[in-house]
A protein has these predicted regions:
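Extracytosolic ligand-binding ectodomains
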Residues: 2-8, 12-14, 24-383
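N-terminal signal peptide c-region/cleavage motif recognized by signal peptidases
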Residues: 17-19
């Protein structure tokens, strides 16, 4: 071998030794509800993901987004596919509580971290060992229920009625509002259920109105939350009407119309970031996200649900560079390192400050809640 060839080989080997390590793509698998009853929640999530970067920490991100049609079975099928066929390093989703709860066992058994965009605290219940692999970005129902009950008490409410979805979301909210009501000296005098796709709730509303509570809470999400609201107005109910943070999107305002004026609900502060003081920690992050979102999708197109998708990215943007120091994407070691990094996250999102711990895989506190009212079709901070 000639000296020139040996020199070339040596130079190549030396260059390779000091070249940056090339990792495989980081695969983020997403299942969300872009169609079906929860579409008004899932569409802004999907829209937000389309705005997100395709690199984190200098490494390429491969986004795979699937629609579960608001169906639990499809959410499970999507999750299995993303893990077994696409080798996802992390799962984001789903949009609603029943779907997310059904996904917990799958990701835990596969040891793939998951960031849910649904609300129920059951999704990250530390008493369930499977939730070691699960995190979520929306505020816990308990945090929001406390805000509602405190607002009711401060405004003279003594008795309340409840109507909510006949599923895990509605059941969770009924349990939480009963707990929060008792803690604030309020009495729940009636509770009713309905299905997300019901077109009439006349029977349930008549029972609620007959109980004559000072206020009624509707435990629903998306446009189906308008069904009992419109019926209550039609039946001339004169008390205060509260909704959950699950209805905070333009489609709900459009469907509910004037019947929702005066409605009260707890919400992440991002929705009304312009009305927040400069000292609020989320204002800067929320402004950046909403400015970008509305530049593409139109003025006042913001929703809290899009914010949940963005906050999922905020968490991953923090955790992925940490995990990359421990292992390469596409490996079980990387997924474990990513889970560990998520559990130590301390970051500011659009909804609040996420301070994760082994016992708290949501990490939000009272800074993630403001009470708002609907005033002539606009979201306004409540007094």
């Amino acid at each position: 071998m000639s000296r020139s060839i040996r020199s070339a080989i040596a130079a190549f080997a030396l260059g390779a030794a000091f070249a940056p390590v090339a990792f495989a793509d980081i695969t983020i698998g997403v299942t969300l509800s872009a169609t079906g009853p929860a579409a008004s929640l899932g569409i802004p999530e999907k829209n937000t993901i389309e705005l997100l970067p395709h690199t984190i920490g200098g490494e390429k991100i491969k986004w795979i987004v699937l629609d579960d049609g608001s169906d639990t079975t499809r959410a499970v099928t999507n999750t299995r596919k993303l893990i077994s066929e696409d080798n996802a390093d992390v799962i984001v989703g789903s949009t609603v509580t029943p779907n997310s709860l059904a996904m917990v066992d799958i990701v835990a058994d596969a040891q793939v971290p998951m960031v849910s965009m649904a609300a129920s605290a059951r999704i990250v219940d530390p008493a369930n060992p499977k939730t070691k692999w699960v995190f979520k970005v929306p505020q816990n129902d308990s945090l929001m229920a406390d805000a509602i009950a405190k607002h009711m008490k401060a405004h003279g409410v003594k008795t309340l009625g409840y109507i909510g979805f006949n599923d895990a979301y509605g059941e969770s909210w009924l349990a939480e509002i009963k707990r929060a009501a008792a803690a604030n000296g309020l009495q729940v005098v009636a509770d009713e259920k309905y299905n997300r796709n019901d077109t009439s709730v006349t029977g349930q509303v008549l029972k609620l109105v007959a109980a004559n509570p000072d206020a009624i809470l509707i435990g629903a999400s998306g446009t189906p939350g308008a069904t009992p609201q419109k019926e209550l107005v039609a039946r001339h109910y004169k008390g205060k009407i509260y909704q959950t943070h699950g209805v905070a999107n333009p489609d709900f305002l459009r469907v509910c119309g004037a019947d929702c004026d005066g409605t009260l609900l707890p919400i992440g502060p991002m929705l009304v970031f312009e009305q927040l003081p400069e000292s609020n920690p989320v204002k800067k992050v929320a402004a950046k996200y909403i400015t970008q979102y509305e530049a593409k999708y139109g003025k006042d197109s913001r929703t809290t649900f899009g914010g949940h998708a963005y906050d999922s990215f905020v968490l991953l943007e923090h955790a992925i560079p940490v995990a990359l120091k421990a292992a390469q994407p596409g490996t079980k070691e990387f997924r474990a390192a990513l889970r560990d990094a998520l559990e130590k996250a301390d970051v500011v999102g659009t909804h609040g400050v996420f301070v994760m711990t082994p016992q708290n895989h949501n990490g939000l506190d009272e800074r993630a809640v403001v009470m708002i009212t609907i005033d002539n079709g606009k979201w306004m901070l409540a007094k």
